[in-house]
Curated annotation (Swiss-Prot):
Gene it is expressed from: murC
Catalytic activity: UDP-N-acetyl-alpha-D-muramate + L-alanine + ATP = UDP-N-acetyl-alpha-D-muramoyl-L-alanine + ADP + phosphate + H(+)
Pathway this chain belongs to: Cell wall biogenesis; peptidoglycan biosynthesis
Protein's recorded name: UDP-N-acetylmuramate--L-alanine ligase
Keywords, comma-separated and alphabetical: ATP-binding, Cell cycle, Cell division, Cell shape, Cell wall biogenesis/degradation, Cytoplasm, Ligase, Nucleotide-binding, Peptidoglycan synthesis
A GO MF term: UDP-N-acetylmuramate-L-alanine ligase activity
Chief localization: cytoplasm
InterPro entries: Mur-like_cat_sf (IPR036565), Mur_ligase_C (IPR004101), Mur_ligase_C_dom_sf (IPR036615), Mur_ligase_cen (IPR013221), Mur_ligase_N (IPR000713), MurCDEF_pg_biosynth (IPR050061), UDP-N-AcMur_Ala_ligase_MurC (IPR005758)
Keyword Cell division found: yes
Xref: HAMAP family: MurC
Biological classification of the source: Bacteria, Bacillati, Actinomycetota, Actinomycetes, Micromonosporales
Record GO cellular component, one term: cytoplasm
Pfam families per record: Mur_ligase, Mur_ligase_C, Mur_ligase_M
Function: Cell wall formation.
Residue span of region Disordered: 481-511
Organism (species): Salinispora arenicola (strain CNS-205)
């Protein structure tokens, strides 16, 4: 591991959560930051946070004793010892600047999380995609085995309503983010790497550098621990070969005949997925998931393999996966209105976009699949435009929002206007809407009974599901098609950078 890659982050093990004193989190409402705040609050640590939007997570933080400021002000830092920020916060943010002026301890989210993990056996889940779902599955398997792990997940486990927990057991399960190299500060006992594909090229430049970073991450694994990765993924296979040549403990899973945990008779339907698992020709039994998709089966296999290598009872893994409720924003069913089924999905990289849309096409059956997509990050939309466009074309119809890219500088010609031209769908089956309110109206105009609609992409798009259901219900009730929740028609109100510069209302057809 090069010193350059982690120069601005403090490695794990140098701080404990109690060393941090009173903690303030800038932008506390997002899933990652709110989970961290919840973890500290349940450990009895004083926590405050600042936010500009009333995220659903904030009520829970207040109930735990957190102080939430609905503004960014220097006065928010009074009485604070440590200020925590995420990569979404610009370095010139007034609270960050003031914290440094006052000489307060300033930590990146990953550094604060590393402090919380001190003294525990860390199970870190990394990968280009599938991290949140896999971290959730591993967590539930450990919970079912009775070891009460602590965890911080980049999402909320459905029906649990939280992405963080302070447990009493020795294990701490964490989702490790490669986007800014911050995963290189962790010192895992178990490292799970789901896959390695081109992404975050603004940080790494090319795939070779990204693969090198994942190799560095794997090398940080405790010598008494092990690495788990996917034999069905080309990047992960290359990683496994490299690590084995270095004499490291690495184990693979997948349908490949040379996988250490081999999956056979895998079958997926709209009701879920099942497979048989074996090690060295010895059956470990049948495993079932109530969520569909081959990729979900592969994610779950990493949890089975980790449990097997940790010596945990596999009946716990079988039971946990059979009851897996899913993760919010990962193939999440939002509801039905006017016989149109609405889902929400976090996918924004071309591979998970394609996987999710193929699975949803099975769900749609004879109905059509309509995707409402908000690209996440200008650099990704630019670097992977062709691949994203091809993945979106799996849908029958596309409603495209402007790119969500907080803190990014927009160059001329960048954004969703360029992306929609690249999507190989007929002009009448794709549309770019330049306001948030226009999207539900457009979906209500296009969707027919029996269709499936999915909101997909950047975090703000998760807020649209209820609006779509309201618009479809209003259509059924005979309300004007242009009516949106709140009684407005059209409009150009933006959410979190949805429409740069305050575009005019309405929808403009692609073509």
């Amino acid at each position: 591991m090069s010193a350059k890659s982690t120069a601005r982050f403090t490695p794990a093990g140098q701080l404990t959560a109690e060393d941090l004193g009173a903690i303030h989190l800038i932008g506390v409402g997002g899933v990652g930051m709110s989970g961290l705040a919840r973890l500290f609050l349940t450990r009895g640590i004083s926590v405050s946070g600042s936010e500009l939007r009333e995220w659903p997570s904030l009520a829970g933080l207040r109930a735990l004793g957190g102080t939430i400021y609905m503004s960014h002000e220097v006065a928010n830092l009074d009485g604070v010892d440590t200020v925590v920020y995420s990569s979404a916060i610009p370095q010139d943010h007034l609270e960050l600047v003031e914290a440094r002026r006052r000489g307060l301890r300033v930590l990146h989210r990953s550094e604060a999380l590393a402090a919380a993990m001190t003294g525990r056996r860390t199970v870190a889940v990394a990968g280009t995609h599938g991290k949140t779902t896999t971290t959730s599955m591993v967590t539930m398997v450990l919970q079912q085995a009775g070891v009460d792990p602590s965890f911080v997940i980049g999402g909320e486990i459905s029906e649990v309503g939280s992405g963080a927990h302070h447990g009493t057991g020795e294990y701490f399960v964490v989702e490790a983010d490669e986007s800014d190299r911050s995963f290189l500060i962790y010192r895992p006992f178990v490292s799970i790497i789901t896959n390695i594909e081109a992404d975050h090229l603004n940080t790494y430049g090319d795939l070779a550098n990204l693969e090198a970073a994942f190799a560095d991450f794997a090398r940080l694994t405790d010598p008494d621990g092990f690495v788990v990765t996917c034999a069905d993924d080309a990047g992960s296979r290359r990683l496994a070969e490299t690590l084995r040549a270095e004499g490291r403990r690495v184990y693979t899973y997948g349908t490949s005949t040379d996988a250490d945990l081999r999956l056979t008779e895998m079958a997926s339907s709209t009701r879920g997925i099942r497979y048989l698992a074996e090690v060295d020709g010895r059956s470990l039994g049948e495993f079932r998931l109530p969520v569909p998709g081959r990729h979900m089966g592969l994610n779950s296999a990493s949890a089975v393999l980790a449990a097997y290598l940790l010596g945990l009872p596999l009946d716990a893994a079988e039971a946990a996966l059979a009851a897996f409720p899913g993760v919010r924003r990962r193939f999440e069913r939002k509801g039905v209105a006017d016989n149109v089924l609405v889902y929400d999905e976090y996918a924004y990289h071309p591979t998970p976009i394609a996987l999710a849309l193929r699975t949803l096409r099975e769900v749609a059956g004879d109905g059509r699949l309509i995707v409402v997509f908000q690209p996440y990050r200008l650099y990704r939309t630019r670097d992977l435009q062709t691949e994203i466009a091809e993945a979106l074309a799996i849908a029958d119809e596309l409603v495209l929002l402007e790119v969500f890219g907080p803190g990014e500088l927009r160059e001329p010609g960048e954004g969703s206007a360029a992306l929609i031209e690249a999507v190989p769908l007929p002009a009448d089956r794709k549309v770019f809407v330049d306001s948030w309110e226009a999207a539900p109206v457009e979906v209500a105009r296009r969707a027919r009974p029996g269709d499936v609609v999915v909101t997909m992409g950047a975090p703000p798009s998760s807020l649209m599901g209820e609006q779509l259901l309201d618009a479809l219900s209003a259509r059924r009730a005979g309300s004007p098609v242009g009516t949106v929740p709140g009684g407005e028609v059209g409009g150009a109100t933006t959410i979190g950078g949805t429409v740069p510069g305050g575009s005019a209302p309405g929808a403009s057809a692609a073509g």
